[in-house]
Curated annotation (Swiss-Prot):
The keyword Iron-sulfur does not apply. GO terms for biological process: translation. This is Small ribosomal subunit protein uS8. One of the primary rRNA binding proteins, it binds directly to 16S rRNA central domain where it helps coordinate assembly of the platform of the 30S subunit. GO terms for cellular component: ribonucleoprotein complex; ribosome. PANTHER family: 40S RIBOSOMAL PROTEIN S15A. Part of the 30S ribosomal subunit. InterPro entries: Ribosomal_uS8 (IPR000630), Ribosomal_uS8_CS (IPR047863), Ribosomal_uS8_sf (IPR035987).
Length: 130
């Protein structure tokens, strides 16, 4: 895959692999943000697991898919959202209330919008999954 946004490429690849029923997918190149997003996916139960493989270059992630993702993608442009503004972005990117998750990068790291709302911090909405 080519392009200027590695996160969008990674999520597009995961979405495509899920839609055709693959059990695993390889994301290359790896980055800290992609790893953090995959960790949120794992914590929320959307993937079975992932592993970083150091190939001597940029590295790669091997993702075990569970069939639990209907759609995922990157949010462009990256929107800033306060802790009390997530409902607006839920309506825009998620199909129903309390279904799916927005992935938010905050000063405390990458987390779902549920965790950000619970801790009372805002951040930038970078991705969604449901």
């Amino acid at each position: 895959m080519t392009g200027n946004d590695p996160l969008a490429n990674a999520l597009s690849g995961v979405d495509n692999a899920e839609s055709v029923g693959h059990l695993s997918h390889e994301i290359q190149p790896a980055s800290n943000v992609i790893g953090s997003v995959l960790e949120v996916f794992y914590d929320r139960g959307y993937i079975n697991g992932f592993e970083f493989v150091d190939d001597g270059k940029a590295g790669r992630f091997e993702v075990e898919l569970s069939g639990g993702i209907n759609e995922c993608g990157a949010v462009k442009p990256r929107y800033s959202a306060g802790a009390d503004e997530f409902e607006r972005w839920e309506k825009r990117y998620l199909p129903a209330r309390d279904y799916g998750a927005l992935i938010v990068t905050t000063s405390h790291g990458v987390m779902s919008h549920y965790e950000a709302r619970e801790t009372g911090i805002g951040g930038q909405v970078i991705a969604y999954v449901y």
